[in-house]
Swiss-Prot record:
Entry-linked InterPro entries: Ade_phspho_trans, PRibTrfase_dom, PRTase-like, UPRTase/APRTase
Modified residues (Phosphothreonine): T135
Protein name: Adenine phosphoribosyltransferase
Statement: the UniProt record of this protein carries the keyword Phosphoprotein: yes
GO-annotated molecular function: adenine binding; adenine phosphoribosyltransferase activity; AMP binding
Gene: APRT
NCBIfam families: apt, PRK02304.1-3, PRK02304.1-5
Entry's EC annotation: 2.4.2.7
Length: 180
């Protein structure tokens, strides 16, 4: 069953060469979201991985702005957990913590509400895609500053040639699909 589900998800990923710049192949997850069966398969595969790896040890899923918001709450619901949001800076009310990270051309910032988690709570970070690892690494930094334990980071797609997984170490990382 898992192989056919993974194939269903993989068949929905579209590739757009030279977008947004020459030499880049953009991996478009929009068709996965459009097709209920492939979206359900993606959530199911991620949930089964997390159950097998962590059992009942996970307290929360942390979804990253913005496409992690599409997968995070659905994954949390599938696992019977709550979901906390890690947003681009300036989007959350109340007291927040923030962290900067590097992009290909400049910097960006993420934030989380200071009361989003209690010290010692165990979290899995989810996003749609791992490229350089900057966003997930900043999220892990923020969660660490809240004294949460990051059990793992997961994504639908991983761009292996950008070595983002290495930036996350020692936090384990899992992806459903890998592309160069």
């Amino acid at each position: 069953m898992a192989d056919s589900e993974l194939q269903l998800v993989e068949q929905r990923i579209r590739s757009f060469p030279d977008f947004p710049t020459p030499g880049v192949v953009f991996r478009d997850i929009s068709p996965v979201l459009k097709d209920p069966a492939s979206f359900r398969a993606a959530i199911g595969l991620l949930a089964r991985h997390l159950k097998a790896t962590h059992g009942g040890r996970i307290d929360y899923i942390a979804g990253l702005d913005s496409r992690g918001f599409l997968f995070g709450p659905s994954l949390a619901q599938e696992l019977g957990l709550g979901c906390v949001l890690i947003r681009k800076r300036g989007k959350l009310p109340g007291p927040t913590l923030w962290a900067s990270y590097s992009l290909e051309y400049g910097k960006a910032e993420l934030e989380i509400q200071k009361d989003a988690l209690e010290p010692g709570q165990r979290v899995v970070v989810v996003d749609d895609l791992l490229a350089t690892g900057g966003t997930m690494n900043a999220a892990c930094e923020l969660l660490g500053r809240l004294q949460a334990e990051v059990l793992e980071c997961v994504s639908l797609v991983e761009l292996t040639s950008l070595k983002g997984r290495e930036k996350l170490a020692p936090v384990p990382f899992f992806s459903l699909l890998q592309y160069e």
